[in-house]
Amino acid sequence: MKALHFGAGNIGRGFIGKLLADAGAQLTFADVNQPLLDALNKRKSYQVNVVGEQARVEEVKNVSAVNSGSPEVVALIAEADIVTTAVGPQILARIAATVAQGLITRHQQGNTRPLNIIACENMVRGTSQLKQHVFAALSEDEQRWVEQHVGFVDSAVDRIVPPSEAGSTDILAVTVETFSEWIVDGTQFKGQPPEIVGMELTDNLMAFVERKLFTLNTGHAITAYLGQLAGHQTIRDAILDPAVRQTVKGAMEESGAVLIKRYAFDPQKHAAYINKILSRFENPYLHDDVERVGRQPLRKLSAGDRLIKPLLGTLEYQLPHDSLVTGIAAAMSYRSEQDPQAQELVTLLAQLGPKAALAQISDLPADSEVVEQAVSVYNAMQQKLAH
């Protein structure tokens, strides 16, 4: 199996790339970070530190790398059996032209073996969005051929992979938690789905996408935002603070009530899933900074993301949402010198005031009860900070 993976960052190396390599794939990473590419090509392997109750070091072997702007990438797409990505939602649109070029070359070469493309991003149906961008760069004739021979497979991914420790001398080493989940839409493959240990097939992907978004992502973000307000440095410090934990768990239970209603999840199993996630946030071996996890607050406060989407579900089913609203107010309070979206958030709050700013960012009606509620909690948070 020939595999091409876009994004040789920590998630690419520590999660998706690792599973592909473990499945015996001939794996090539595509990235723009030249020192990283050089190191991968020189060593052909790297180490993954899996940390948790039982820490272990696993070696990933037989890998190579190419620059994602190079002609080699196009040639690799023409030959590959599977193409995956972990580049971040913003970059996905940027690699579409390259993917399209690779598919055109594949067609020209008469390669009709099935190819499956799987975007492994923190977004809902990311591969379907990638497909739209790719199709925008294809003629109608090419589109017809691609529809026949190429599967665009949506997925949900979950593994906490913090940035490398400062002072780590090995550019390729990566640290990951023990837990990992990669769930793919089994209905979207062309040909037989590849056998990859750790990749699970489902015919109800949206249930898993929302379960992860409404629990892991919602909980992680609110832990970061409340943690920063309380002066904590890491996610672990924040979740061990009883006041933070109570709101985070409350928010996950509120979003969980939406999932239970929407997808008929078993309430006891879902409660166990929430507790599992809380214990992952407590992992003492993952030094995950609240400022990093809170980054891009405008995206995280948008209508389809981890804070507003579950809130909309609670409104749809007339369910409680106080903890989610507190999380939204905490997201409005996020500050970071390093993050452009945090700066933009501050500007919007100053120019429009909290009510109009939240309405603009989230698409919630400015005069709605939840916006009023969020603004009142936000104002109380700001007053507390001022004292």
From Swiss-Prot:
PROSITE patterns (alphabetical): MANNITOL_DHGENASE
Protein name: Mannitol-1-phosphate 5-dehydrogenase
Gene: mtlD
Binding site for NAD(+): 3-14
Record's keyword terms, sorted: NAD, Oxidoreductase
Family: Belongs to the mannitol dehydrogenase family.
Catalytic activity: D-mannitol 1-phosphate + NAD(+) = beta-D-fructose 6-phosphate + NADH + H(+)
Keyword Disulfide bond: no
Keyword Translocase among record annotations: no
Lineage: Bacteria, Pseudomonadati, Pseudomonadota, Gammaproteobacteria, Enterobacterales
InterPro entries: 6-PGluconate_DH-like_C_sf (IPR008927), 6PGD_dom2 (IPR013328), Mannitol_1_phos_5_DH (IPR023028), Mannitol_DH (IPR000669), Mannitol_DH_C (IPR013118), Mannitol_DH_CS (IPR023027), Mannitol_DH_N (IPR013131), NAD(P)-bd_dom_sf (IPR036291)
Origin superkingdom: Bacteria
NCBIfam families linked to this entry: PRK02318.1-2, PRK02318.1-3, PRK02318.2-2, PRK02318.2-5
GO molecular function: mannitol-1-phosphate 5-dehydrogenase activity
EC number annotated for this UniProt entry: 1.1.1.17
Enzyme class, UniProt record, top EC level: oxidoreductase
GO cellular component terms attached to this protein's record: cytosol
Any one GO BP annotation for this protein: mannitol catabolic process
Gene3D superfamilies: N-(1-d-carboxylethyl)-l-norvaline Dehydrogenase, domain 2, NAD(P)-binding Rossmann-like Domain
